[in-house]
Amino acid sequence: MSSESSTEGDSDLYDPLAEELHNVQLVKHVTRENIDALNAKFANLQEPPAMYLIEYQELTSKLHELEAKEQELMERLNSQDQQEDSSLVERFKEQPHYQNQTQILQQQRQLARVHHGNDLTDSLGSQPGSQCGTLTRQPKILLRAHLPNQQRTSVEVISGVRLCDALMKALKLRQLTPDMCEVSTTHSGRHIIPWHTDIGTLHVEEIFVRLLDKFPIRTHIKHQIIRKTFFSLVFCEGCRRLLFTGFYCSQCNFRFHQRCANRVPMLCQPFPMDSYYQLLLAENPDNGVGFPGRGTAVRFNMSSRSRSRRCSSSGSSSSSKPPSSSSGNHRQGRPPRISQDDRSNSAPNVCINNIRSVTSEVQRSLIMQARPPLPHPCTDHSNSTQASPTSTLKHNRPRARSADESNKNLLLRDAKSSEENWNILAEEILIGPRIGSGSFGTVYRAHWHGPVAVKTLNVKTPSPAQLQAFKNEVAMLKKTRHCNILLFMGCVSKPSLAIVTQWCEGSSLYKHVHVSETKFKLNTLIDIGRQVAQGMDYLHAKNIIHRDLKSNNIFLHEDLSVKIGDFGLATAKTRWSGEKQANQPTGSILWMAPEVIRMQELNPYSFQSDVYAFGIVMYELLAECLPYGHISNKDQILFMVGRGLLRPDMSQVRSDAPQALKRLAEDCIKYTPKDRPLFRPLLNMLENMLRTLPKIHRSASEPNLTQSQLQNDEFLYLPSPKTPVNFNNFQFFGSAGNI
């Protein structure tokens, strides 16, 4: 009898179904942790590797199988539990207190479900055979957090965990820290919650995280990547190696190699340097930050320049000894804010620049003032243009004037070296096939540290006046940097004039509209016009007139980003007669403004003439055809447009175009230049139109409205990068030549 009871007790202690269920739960927990680890490492990548997708599919399918197995075992355990309950009731039915035993059993099971959750319950009573278990899952309590920039996340409410620790992972992914933000229970930010608050004590379902005013961070969802050749010493921010030809974001200035594209952060978020400097100045307003006060002299103690320092100190002491002593006492009483090394790195040394940049002109000007012969060149900067051997100086103004003169000489020297850096030798450029020709030159695809576009100008033998005008305009073009402007990379002056620009992977707007007949949506059409107006507004802010804006000079990338090319260069776009400019119109006929056709003024090109050409481009987009298609005689078009007798037919504009967009195009092509708006109000109107169009609003954290499942075969036929290793793959390798 005792042996039978012992075997029954062992069978009650060891349940094979419960043991199997426990093992399945452990394997499912490990599988879920593997999936979370894979997602944390590869889910943020725009193009995850194929091995990650395969492993993710295998783990998810395995997880589904384990969940099905767990459900099956739980059903079997429940059925076995019911059978044991029925047998238990029959066994104790003869006893008078069996009803009380049944009630106690049910109460103990309910307590076991609450306290143990998914685990097996312990023994429920002292009676043998009363041990049985139920498996239930306790629901998780989540707290929704609204993050800055219209993003949100959810965290599990666990007692004992601080609020900053619960949100730390979400903040780090967005390059934020708790010091930059504050938490409140309302959207207005009235009820502030401390970061060290226990998350289990919060009695709200959602919280709001917003940035503090002293740390404004402009965040963009999408980077504006631009290919660039860096002529200065630049390092990749992904691998920290030297970067020569690569990419950078025009918004956050993140620079990287092509092979380091997977290290680019998901959010375009520039570092708030201006706010950081403002915060430093606000904390200590008396800090001079290296700027000397009025009547004080600046001392730079550098061991390598001790000789120049001795020369400058001797000259200044002989000319003005009392002010130097007072300033010295002032410096002894108040220590400097910034060390000498930091000052020498942040700004140029005035004494060193004066020594290095003393030219013959300054020496001649000093000799003309009947000064005694100088024993050493380093004493030039200490003497003033209005001082004499017998005069005394009351302040250090003459020294500042000599510093200004030396800075001018330094700027002239830097401008000369910078001009030489932008000049490209014709032997360095590998000319490829001819792409096209226009009214001012011919465009070739070429290779110069990467694919570039070379436009040889029609000015074959430039005169000195033409060459000087060309250099002046190149000096203006090399300062243009904008996301809607083709990047100017350099120029060639010998044997013929040519400019080197960024190569645009795409086709022109003219080809899209009139050759391929691409049907743009209305919001896409307005966005193209907005980008063109934005680029032209930037050029006009730089005092650059395009002179030949047309759909052939507007290029579209695959993502419909706009690049404006062939801007500026009035030297090449002007007819020359010997050493003088000829008074003849240049450009394309259909996009010429009436005042340009008439040529009644010496220089009829203005900002309004570019606005007229922009109006014709907008008419092409709206009507999907060229203006004046019913007239084949060019002279007739020139005469009628110049007299104001011919205007584009606005009845051919697409029917779904809003009236405001039609009025905008009509205002741009008005006959009188003063009646045409400039690009700044045009840009504002186009942005308002694009903002008021009905569209599907989507969250900033999920920019893609529909997420397509990536397949494994999408990663099998990726094109190889255009690097110098694959040099034989260039199309122009067989027909190489020089300018």
From Swiss-Prot:
Changing S360R: In strain: Reids2. Disruption phenotype: RNAi-mediated knockdown in the prothoracic gland (PG) delays the onset of pupariation by prolonging the L3 larval stage. Residues 429-690 form the Protein kinase domain. The keyword Cytoplasm does not apply. Residues 311-328 have a biased composition (Low complexity). Its cofactor is Zn(2+). Keywords: Allosteric enzyme, ATP-binding, Coiled coil, Kinase, Metal-binding, Nucleotide-binding, Phosphoprotein, Serine/threonine-protein kinase, Transferase, Zinc, Zinc-finger. GO terms for cellular component: cytoplasm; cytosol; plasma membrane. The modification Phosphoserine is found at S346. Residues 50-86 form a coiled coil. Extensively phosphorylated 1 to 2 hours after egg laying. A zinc finger (Phorbol-ester/DAG-type) spans 222-268. CDD domains: C1_Raf (cd20811), RBD_RAF (cd01816), STKc_Raf (cd14062). Zn(2+) 1 binds at H220, C249, C252, C268. Its EC number is 2.7.11.1. Residues 380-393 have a biased composition (Polar residues). Binds 2 Zn(2+) ions per subunit. In quiescent cells, maintained in an inactive state via an intramolecular interaction between the protein kinase and N-terminal domains. Following mitogen-mediated cell activation, binds via its RGB domain to active Ras85D (GTP-bound) which releases the inhibitory intramolecular interaction between the two domains. This allows the Dsor1/MEK1-mediated dimerization of ksr and Raf which activates Raf. InterPro entries: C1-like_sf, Kinase-like_dom_sf, PE/DAG-bd, Prot_kinase_dom, Protein_kinase_ATP_BS, RBD_dom, Ser-Thr/Tyr_kinase_cat_dom, Ser/Thr_kinase_AS. Belongs to the protein kinase superfamily. TKL Ser/Thr protein kinase family. RAF subfamily. Interacts with Dsor1/MEK1 and ksr; Dsor1 binding to ksr probably promotes ksr and Raf dimerization and ksr-mediated Raf transactivation. This is Raf homolog serine/threonine-protein kinase Raf. The gene is Raf.
